[in-house]
UniProtKB/Swiss-Prot annotation:
This is FMN-dependent NADH:quinone oxidoreductase. GO terms for molecular function: electron transfer activity; FMN binding; oxidoreductase activity, acting on NAD(P)H as acceptor; oxidoreductase activity, acting on NAD(P)H, quinone or similar compound as acceptor. Its cofactor is FMN. Its EC number is 1.6.5.-, 1.7.1.17. The gene is azoR.
Length: 208
């Protein structure tokens, strides 16, 4: 089994989402000791946001007369897509920033959403090509957004990720959430304990 861990928080060791992604991967490895793990830290070498120039290369594949930088960006994009497609399990660290995902994570999504590779257009609509994998989303939030409709309407984080992954054909998605972590030490500890309890269940091997 190949596990791909994606981290997007710039907070380093202070990041709650990184704490959760590390715990999720550890639990999965406990259940499947021979699993191969790759880590993509989107804050160490963040992919550039798409410009008009980059769109022509990495999205529309106009490949004549590429500059050295364009060749590098094309190679990076293809590597990110290959890495995503090769993974059996993807663990995504996704803190909520201003009601949505960090800019680094959005830039990664823009690279892996590739027509002809992770989805394709048909006469009846788009079809995802990246199915057959499991995704865990380590969702962290300073406030609480899951308990009432008014706050849930502000969620452009988990809902966005489920939409994008579904578009790519990935429907086996589990969200492990720690919310309210900015509402004081007690709320933070309670949220982390609840998330860890969910994670601990992943460490139990599945009977053949």
């Amino acid at each position: 089994m190949k596990i791909l861990r994606i981290d997007s928080s710039p907070l380093g060791d202070a990041s709650v989402s990184r704490q959760l992604t590390a715990s999720i991967v550890a639990a999965l490895r406990q259940a499947t000791p021979d699993a191969e793990v790759s880590v993509r830290d989107l804050t160490v070498a963040p992919p550039d946001h798409l410009t008009g120039e980059l769109m022509q290369v990495v999205k529309f594949r106009n490949l004549e007369g590429l500059t050295a930088r364009q060749q590098e960006e094309l190679a990076l994009t293809d590597a990110l897509v290959d890495e995503f497609l090769a993974a059996d399990v993807v663990v995504i660290g996704a803190p909520m920033y201003n009601f949505t995902v960090p800019t680094q994570l959005k830039a990664w999504i823009d690279r892996i959403a590739q027509a002809g590779r992770t989805f394709r257009y048909t006469e009846t609509g788009p079809v995802g090509l990246a199915g057959g994998k499991k995704v865990y989303i380590a969702s962290t939030r300073g406030g609480v957004y899951s308990t009432n409709a008014a706050m849930s309407a502000l969620d452009h984080q988990e809902a966005f990720l489920r939409t994008v992954l579904g578009f790519l054909g990935v429907t086996d998605v589990t969200v492990i959430r720690a919310e309210g972590v900015g509402m004081g030490p007690d709320a933070r500890a309670k949220a982390l304990a609840a998330a860890q309890q969910e994670i601990d269940a992943l460490a139990v091997p599945v009977a053949a």
